[in-house]
Swiss-Prot record:
<keyword id="KW-0732">Signal</keyword>
<keyword id="KW-0325">Glycoprotein</keyword>
<comment type="function">
    <text>Involved in the early part of the secretory pathway.</text>
</comment>
<dbReference type="GO" id="GO:0009306">
    <property type="term" value="P:protein secretion"/>
</dbReference>
<keyword id="KW-0812">Transmembrane</keyword>
<dbReference type="InterPro" id="IPR009653">
    <property type="entry name" value="Ksh1"/>
</dbReference>
<dbReference type="GO" id="GO:0046907">
    <property type="term" value="P:intracellular transport"/>
</dbReference>
<keyword id="KW-1133">Transmembrane helix</keyword>
<feature type="transmembrane region" description="Helical">
    <location>
        <begin position="54"/>
        <end position="71"/>
    </location>
</feature>
<keyword id="KW-0472">Membrane</keyword>
<protein>
    <recommendedName>
        <fullName>Protein kish-A</fullName>
    </recommendedName>
</protein>
<feature type="signal peptide">
    <location>
        <begin position="1"/>
        <end position="26"/>
    </location>
</feature>
<dbReference type="GO" id="GO:0000139">
    <property type="term" value="C:Golgi membrane"/>
</dbReference>
<feature type="topological domain" description="Cytoplasmic">
    <location>
        <position position="72"/>
    </location>
</feature>
<feature type="topological domain" description="Extracellular">
    <location>
        <begin position="27"/>
        <end position="53"/>
    </location>
</feature>
<comment type="similarity">
    <text>Belongs to the KISH family.</text>
</comment>
<keyword id="KW-0333">Golgi apparatus</keyword>
Length: 72
């Protein structure tokens, strides 16, 4: 099933996007900072969420990992 129609898969994709953008911004900040608006601004916003809400994002990643491991 597609990640759009499955809520758990959609949350997993969003969490991975946030974590990946925050990691890329920590390595090369200029790559995401030049695109703050428009379609590519989504990646900058995800990086900001990952930086500012990092304890919450980490907790959500742990919960999601446990859910994926122990579901079914």
């Amino acid at each position: 099933m597609s990640a759009i129609f499955n809520f758990q898969s959609l949350l997993t994709v969003i969490l991975l996007l946030i974590c990946t953008c925050a990691y890329i911004r920590s390595l090369t900040p200029s790559l995401l900072d030049k695109n703050k608006t428009g379609f590519l601004g989504i990646f900058w916003k995800c990086a900001r969420i990952g930086e500012r809400k990092s304890p919450y994002v980490a907790f959500c990643c742990i919960v999601m990992a446990l859910t994926i491991l122990f579901s079914e």
